[in-house]
């Protein structure tokens, strides 16, 4: 739905964020400090998407013309250039837990040789738009510097939401956090805005609208949670307890818990471990009317008690097997994936040995269930050295539901029975890991519709919980294994607790940063599924993804969002600052940066590659990245290895020796050569005899590069100054920034959407 480039990382991040979007997109981002380990694992271990139940075309309620009419009403005059024949109707479907019928409509058209595309999803009898995506045929005006400013885009989004839901009140929230590491310059500028629906001027947690506006002013994405506003009921806002009173109540019960936090840099594959303090994890909020504590199990008059840490097994257990082959792994997978249905056929697509992002040698089995004219598949991973399961998700219940073979299942296991099953599966399929993990310290998450229990067994080191590392086990209503995921990162040395601030000091810092946000939210344990409770949600600090550093007692941010350096320059200020905001240029301190300083060849190629392509150096992506070594002095451990090897692959750098001088300054003439090669015009530039350059310093241009310089100048990439090209002058950061942006525009003119 979103154009996020070709990177596997960006796709995976989007999936994760989609699953936890309700929490992350709310203004209570720092509520994540209170989120339990259980919640984190459930959202991140890749649980399957919702099952779509297809509806026969004969049962479709709305015609194509009705859908087109509703679409045009939502976007008056915007798509008048489309004819009815440009639209196509997709299938209708519903979800098992939401019987509202959904209809899909798409459109495509070619204008001046360029194709545009879009789709829209409607839900319910009123054909409420649930999602919308539009890919225009021309995005030139959306490239930096964009035609539409952020302020103008904000007004466009606000006006659109007002028209979309005239009778409902939506509140524009603060700018959403930039989750992605960088954006290449051939991608158009996008502005994202988040709106929360309100009732009695209080935001509703699960009623949101997300809108993206392109840099040319066009609305390109919309997503909103479908609502049953006609049947929803809400707590009386006049009956809530005083906010300050509740705040003091929370502070009085607050405790600080020491945790290990692993920060993983996917680009370098480095892992840094630090000690952090986190508040009581079992508390979700406080009911605003009764003052009861909200936990995973509902409301309680008693504050949730901290669970004592208990190892699954005190001593190491032997691995399940002493290494397995690809054929062994395939047999294990077939045992897990076997499905008892004549309507479904299992197909093993591939069995490969890979190294996962935790550095483990695993065997990856890609498989597909084929049924009717559809199919559904995913990947299973098995540890090559131990034969133990690393990742498994059962799709069989979903498949059965799609083909109508499995009825609604009531929960038939008690929590205790399901936990015993989960421990049994952990001992059977990951025995060699278990001495590093503890019994669940948080309540199980229960998918009540299917009766599935999800348990999280946290990793323990030095009697301290390791945040993010866990074994996640899902147990189905019939006691079968529904999901299994082991996240275990190899860490050589764990920080000592000798120099951490005291628990009391940490608790004081948490209390100082704590605030409460009044929110309407549904409580899963409530029998009335349409009722919204008023809840005070805890918030810490103002920075999203913030944490309390246990060694300094200070607040830090995992991503340092909103704290980018800002620099000044007489003629390239906006370009340089855009490079910084797009994470193309890494500047720690704007005061020390000199935009007129010379750029080395190594730094120049790094900036060019970061501007035009997505490069990931980490182990998890190494299967898709370069493994060759072109230059003796640039081995795979060199920080510029991927950038230089990618430049060689793209013929930007054409090796003429055994080494590459990363430290020597890049001259303007050399920069012109690189740019022309980026555009694929190397052959056109090589015949220097057909080019005439009349610069005052034309004699300083090397003969073999006359064509490159002539083209770079005529295309406006590198311009003359007082009729001097200055081919042997060292290029500066400012020149590089301005000229690369021009290059990005030329690239999109040549091939819209081009990105390496």
Q: Where are these predicted regions, by residue range?
A:
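Short, non-transmembrane alpha-helical segments in secretory-pathway proteins
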Residues: 53-91, 145-184, 233-266, 314-352, ...
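Second-shell loop/turn segments in exported
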Residues: 53-61, 140-148, 235, 315-323, ...
